[in-house]
Amino acid sequence: MAPLLLLFLLGGLCALFSLASSSPATKKCGDAKKRREEEGEEVVVVAKKRPEEEPRRPDPDADLGIVFSTFDHDGDGFITAAELEESLKRLGIAVSSAAEAAALVARVDANSDGLIDIHEFRELYDSIPKRRKSHQQHPLPSTAAADEEAAAADEEYEAEEEERDLREAFDVFDGNKDGLISAEELGTVLESLGLRQHGGRPAVAECRDMIRLVDSDGDGMVSFEEFKRMMTVVKA
């Protein structure tokens, strides 16, 4: 999988992570329940949703910051070529050499300091969908039939390319290669990326919440088809 596309997929994952792990109503209810239990009261909680509450929407700025922090290992606000190379290796994405990692950095390093800051990272992240559509095209005679044929060929090429990329991304999460992503497998990937809830290891329950957002058949797993639908939504 192209390392640049990986950044886009991580953005979708982080959006799901933030949606599943931060529900204000759930947190307030849990805090109140804990206080009353500490005071010795028997507590029965019935979850209710206030009429004025709306489902939490992903915050693009916050999600981008989470993705950035997974690569910025030392937290200094910059991504080095070495940090980029190490992050990709954690996910099983091979980088052939340090020079290749440096070349990836150089592609967006506007001030030529050898580092990627958050602004350069945003420019890279926003450009990824456009890059996917910029493959080389062979010129054809400019006729209506030729234009229609070229458009169909482009759509087919793009669909095949996206299918391959998504399959490779899916395989990163599917640790045992059974064709399904479990909560445990998702937690392992989150941990490898440094995405931890409240500074600790991602709880399996939180990973189940993430899966529930995209699990259309209710089996507690994410199939490849569900994974593709998920990525279609987060890229929209």
UniProtKB/Swiss-Prot annotation:
Annotated spans, Disordered: 43-64, 130-158
InterPro entries for this protein: EF-hand-dom_pair, EF_Hand_1_Ca_BS, EF_hand_dom, EF_hand_pair_protein_CML-like
Chain positions recorded as Ca(2+) 1 binding sites: D72, D74, D76, E83
EF-hand domain sequence ranges: 59-94, 96-131, 161-196, 202-236
Keyword Repeat: yes
UniProt entry tagged with the keyword Secreted: no
Positions contributing to Ca(2+) 4 binding: D215, D217, D219, M221, E226
Extent of Acidic residues compositional bias: 146-158
Chain positions recorded as Ca(2+) 2 binding sites: D109, N111, D113, E120
Residues the record lists as binding Ca(2+) 3: D174, N176, D178, E185
GO molecular function: calcium ion binding
Residue spans of biased composition, Basic and acidic residues class: 49-60
Keyword set, alphabetical order: Calcium, Metal-binding, Repeat
Function: Potential calcium sensor.
The protein, known as: Probable calcium-binding protein CML30
Originating species: Oryza sativa subsp. japonica
